[in-house]
Every structure is written in structure tokens, then in C-alpha cells.
């Protein structure tokens, strides 16, 4: 029984490595970009702003999280 579980686990992991996690059409991924605060305030299209810890550690920039459909990549 342990051998069967081990084989199922390894085959599942191999499938994910070959296929890719979240690479199915219709799924959403989040792309994060840093932009100057003035650009963010004055019209750059961003659906969600956040402070992402050390990612945008400059006080003059903000993080923009943009949902991207896998069909568009």
C-alpha cells in the first residue's frame, strides 16, 4: 500500500512539473509591479494597490497587483 501511495505521489508531482501549476486556460494569476505614487494617483490603470513589504520598499512608490488571465499570456 505504501508503494502505491508513493507511486501516485511521484506521478502527480511529475505531472505538475511537466504541465505547470496554474497553467490552465481561464485561470487568473497576479502580476505585481512597482510604480511611482504620482503615476498611480494620476491615471495609471491599477485595480488594487498594496504595500508588499520589501517588494516596493521605496517610500515614493506603490505596488500594483494586476490580475492577468492565462488566456491573454
Swiss-Prot record:
Principal subcellular localisation of the protein: secreted
Disulfide bridges in this chain: 34-63, 46-64
Keywords: Antibiotic, Antimicrobial, Defensin, Disulfide bond, Secreted, Signal
Endpoints of the signal sequence: 1-23
Domain of life: Eukaryota
Tissues showing expression: Highly expressed in prostate. Not expressed in uterus, epididymis, ovary, testis, spleen, submaxillary gland, thymus, thyroid, pancreas, smooth muscle, skeletal muscle, heart, kidney, lung, liver, eye and brain.
Pfam families, sorted: Defb50
Localization terms from the record: Secreted
InterPro entries reported for this sequence: Defb50 (IPR035193)
Biological processes, Gene Ontology terms: defense response to bacterium
A cellular component term, taken from the record's GO annotations: extracellular region
Entry's family note: Belongs to the beta-defensin family.
Reported function: Has bactericidal activity.
Protein name as annotated: Beta-defensin 50
Recorded name of the encoding gene: Defb50
Amino acid at each position: 500500500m505504501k508503494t502505491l501511495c508513493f507511486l501516485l505521489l511521484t506521478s502527480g508531482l511529475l505531472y505538475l512539473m511537466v504541465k505547470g501549476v496554474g497553467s490552465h486556460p481561464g485561470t487568473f494569476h497576479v502580476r505585481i509591479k512597482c510604480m511611482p505614487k504620482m503615476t498611480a494617483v494620476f491615471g495609471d490603470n491599477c485595480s488594487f494597490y498594496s504595500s508588499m513589504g520589501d517588494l516596493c520598499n521605496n517610500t515614493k512608490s506603490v505596488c500594483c497587483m494586476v490580475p492577468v488571465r492565462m488566456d491573454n499570456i
